[in-house]
A protein has these predicted regions:
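Bacterial N-terminal signal peptides
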Residues: 7-16
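Non-catalytic cap/lid and distal C-terminal segments of serine-dependent acyl enzymes
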Residues: 20-290
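Positively charged n-region of N-terminal signal peptides that target proteins for export
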Residues: 1-5
């Protein structure tokens, strides 16, 4: 009994120590008086050639400063609803409003796209989720979806830049590895990546990326990796270890990268609160280069 009581006491005293940090949003993640607000348009995409039969919601954020006569930078967010939601983990539209107004980042259109689902053919049946196939697979299929399916649809209404330095990607978990895969497959089209708690584990072979990065000539990609010490450890792999391996491989090969390790779990709390700084870093020299 004494051992049990002692163990319980140790556990109770240890829990506050390992409690996850209470990450706080900065003023950049809240609406500010006098800052022009962009508009958000919700759409549905249901005519994919790359993923036939899928249906997905997506949202377009258009900043107040958008000029249709100028090719405009853009960022594609995987699991888009989580990023665009007013009370989501990132509040990206508000952050865009503030940083664009402060001229800390270029004028950017946000494209927030959800993973596809395949509607059930049975009445009352549940749709089949296509997320892991789209996000965790290591090939060019999702990049082709963006380049051949979705972006041409967006370009019907908006003037998107063709400059790969102005085309960026962001995602969380499987969406994070997806963002990397798109840039890895098509660095001629996308060269900026932000990954929250990226799933560089063996869901569909993503654990191979560190070795691939080390053995492949450096590609012109800039990447920000965020991870948490208390992230997942399961049959697919260990997320903190996988992201450390990614960071080590990027360093070895000479990539322009930044790696931030917090103490968070498998969620967007840490990444969401530092998103403004992620944007500042990823876009830090874009206007100067123009």
């Amino acid at each position: 009994m004494k051992i049990l009581v002692t163990s319980f006491f140790i556990l109770c005293t240890f829990l506050p120590f390992v409690a996850l940090s209470d990450y706080k949003y900065t003023e950049d993640s809240f609406p500010k008086d006098g800052v022009p607000k962009g508009k958000i348009i919700k759409k549905v995409f249901a005519k994919s050639k790359i993923y036939p039969g899928t249906v997905r919601d997506y949202w377009i954020y258009v900043p107040d400063q958008y000029n249709s006569e100028k090719p405009t930078c853009f960022m594609v967010f995987q699991d888009g609803n989580w990023y665009q939601a007013a009370k989501g983990h990132t509040r990206a539209p508000v952050v865009f409003d503030n940083l664009i107004h402060q001229k800390e980042i270029p004028v950017i259109i946000g494209i927030f796209v959800n993973p596809g689902v395949i509607p059930s053919k049975k009445e009352g049946g549940k749709p089949r989720k296509n997320r892991s196939l789209e996000y965790d697979t290591l090939n060019d299929q999702y990049s082709r979806f963006l380049l051949e399916d979705l972006l041409p649809e967006v370009e019907k209404d908006y003037n998107l830049t063709k400059d790969p330095e102005g085309r960026s990607l962001c995602g969380i978990s499987s969406g994070g590895i997806c963002a990397w895969t798109v840039a890895w497959e098509r660095p001629d089209q996308f060269r900026k990546v932000i990954s929250y708690i990226g799933s560089f584990t063996n869901i569909r072979g993503g654990h191979a990326y560190p070795a691939m990065i080390r053995k492949t000539e450096k590609k012109p990609i800039r990447v920000f990796l965020q991870e948490g010490e208390n992230d997942l450890d399961n049959l697919h792999g260990n997320w903190p270890l996988a992201n450390r391996q990614m960071a080590a491989a990027l360093k070895f090969t000479g990539y322009d990268y930044k790696f931030v390790m917090g103490d968070g779990a498998h969620n967007g709390k840490h990444g969401g609160t530092i998103f403004p700084d992620m944007l500042r870093w990823i876009w830090r020299d874009y206007e100067k280069a123009k």
